[in-house]
Amino acid sequence: DARNTENELDLEDILNIPSAGFNNVRYYAWAWAGCEFFQNHPKTKQIFSKLPELAKLDEDRFNREFLDLHGNNLEELKRDWLLFINEIDYGYSVPRGCLSKASSPGGQLNSGQIKFRISAERSWQVTEQNVQQGERFRIKSSGEYVVGQSNPQTPWKCQPNGITIQYHRGRPLGRLQAGILDLNAKTAEQQVKGLLNPLDIGLSGVISAPTSG
């Protein structure tokens, strides 16, 4: 309930929860969310497993040491954290929810078209194609994947339009969406804003880029 409100905590807020704060249900829940994230994120799980070695340090030094261990990954972790708390639900997979890179098997096609392969089992995948605010372009998609099953013999096969047997946030389950990641923005919140407010695509959609990215 605290997501997307003034009570939302970023990664550094999580680390700065005082010891007395764990008597508060709100802070306790946020701390466990942080543990789930750090324990399962591909770039933090090994470091997280070594935290008992830092337990003898005072709170301030513990936090500094922990942040220093993440080095150049901190900005990436901040983005992934925001995506995590926006989507977290029962059964959520942190590794699959992290930003990843879309593959480009065919390179650039004729007429300025570019082809990418998107993995249906992962969340946002970056194409590394730059767009300018107001630029219009069309995205077409094809393929088939399974998004669920009634039983082992009845898989829910799906195409990029999604299936209306179940909806997620007002859209058919499995429907293709697009978002603009603005890595030039100053904060992680501004960088992933376009991913938290995705554009509907399905099998085909024309986008007028709301921002550059």
Name the predicted role of every residue range.
Residues 90-213:
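Gly-Asp-aromatic-enriched flexible segments
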Residues 1-93:
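Acidic/His/Gly-enriched intrinsically disordered linker/tail segments
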